Amino acid sequence: MRTFDRREALGLAALLGTSLLTLSGCESGEPTAADSSAPSDEGEDGSLYVPAEDDPYATGVHHATIEVEGYGTMEVALNANVAPITVSNFCHLAEEGFYDGLTFHRIIEGFMIQGGDPQGNGTGGAEKNIKGEFSSNGVENNIPHVRGTISMARSQDPDSASSQFFIMQETAEHLDGEYAAFGNVTSGIEVVDAICESVPVEDSNGTVAAENQPVIAAISVVD
């Protein structure tokens, strides 16, 4: 397992590079969309997703399950009181079946797993981007990037997140205030551990060959 210093170095490199989460796939660098590829999820028309005024997912705490083929199911709590745009976007994409059959394309043991890219390489996203709900982008967000946190990948553009997300295996405080954390795993974190421990990666950026990428069977909104 990599040390925290290594993870931090990768994260900073991704942020500067093109995303950790794009960091090859995340959507942003650190998890920049995690890697150099931060995906820069810019909708086709360049517009940002805005929840409807009566959107039930834009307030309160919601719950969803993330089922990964061959690994099991994670249960997550999503806090729209902190990140209403992010939670609304995620829940609606899940309800549409957007995530079903997509993969985790970037995996860094001791750091995080990143997925939700229809291209499977950190460069794709949904039709629209969302505003980055984190402090360096002018939005208060007190959810820390600790073990089990779910957060959005992005590119260097603070408003470039779209569909790619990452789940923390270990704490990475340097991501706080720079990425839109919007919930946490409440059950099944061992799924993340199993993925990190068993999936072979191609490089230090956590790139996973297409044939080895864990498949998201379904993301289902519970309430």
Specify the residue positions occupied by each region the protein language model found.
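Cyclophilin-like peptidyl-prolyl cis-trans isomerases
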Residues: 2-223
